[in-house]
């Protein structure tokens, strides 16, 4: 039931944005009663924050599995991690948290956990090829590119990536 609520919350964030997401709609999409939803998540903030954290954990696990399977890592890992509908669900949360004190308070600890997970995962994936600062720069650059991609079409986005990735890779990796 918890997983259904988390998935429904992400679906709502993607489809309706944070302001259009309601706990009633999440419960409806999850196929659970409002009481069951409240038992697991007493507030909208707690539910959407848990949903985004769940997404981050899933995505990091996928990246670590790919690394364990021998897939070579490049800075494209950051672009892939911070793009698409799932990233935009998290972005909805950040934007709403800017002006919503309760959500802001809920998102701050999440951001700390996400940053720790990214740093830990980046160290595993890149080893000595990237310093912690290079990982941080890469995260910030990938997030910025993902936001600006909202205003580019797929073709221009791919062209931009093709031009920037080799330069970015050379700047942040040690070999």
Please state what every model-predicted region is.
Residues 42-46, 50, 98, 102, ...:
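Residues in soluble alpha-helical coiled-coils and helical-bundle/repeat scaffolds
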Residues 46, 50, 60-88, 134-138, ...:
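Hydrophobic alpha-helical connector segments
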Residues 44, 51, 55-59, 86, ...:
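Hydrophobic/aromatic residues within well-ordered alpha-helical segments
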Residues 104-108, 124-175:
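Hydrophobic/aromatic-rich alpha-helical bundle segments in the mid-to-C-terminal region
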Residues 8-15, 62, 89, 93, ...:
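Solvent-exposed, amphipathic alpha-helical segments
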């Amino acid at each position: 039931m918890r997983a259904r609520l988390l998935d429904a919350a992400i679906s709502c964030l993607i489809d309706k944005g944070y302001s259009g997401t309601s706990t009633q709609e999440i419960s409806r999409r999850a196929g659970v009663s409002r009481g069951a939803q409240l038992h697991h998540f007493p507030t909208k903030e707690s539910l959407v924050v848990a949903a985004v954290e769940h997404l981050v954990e899933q995505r990091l696990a996928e990246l670590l599995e790919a690394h364990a399977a021998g897939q070579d890592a490049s800075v494209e890992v950051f672009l892939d991690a911070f793009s698409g509908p799932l990233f935009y669900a998290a972005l909805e949360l950040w934007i709403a948290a800017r002006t919503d004190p309760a959500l802001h308070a809920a998102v701050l600890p999440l951001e700390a956990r996400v940053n720790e997970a990214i740093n830990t995962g980046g160290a595993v994936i890149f080893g000595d090829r990237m310093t912690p600062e290079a990982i941080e720069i890469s995260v910030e650059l990938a997030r910025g590119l993902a936001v600006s991609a909202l205003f580019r079409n797929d073709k221009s986005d791919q062209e931009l990536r093709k031009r920037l990735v080799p330069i970015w890779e050379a700047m942040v990796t040690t070999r």
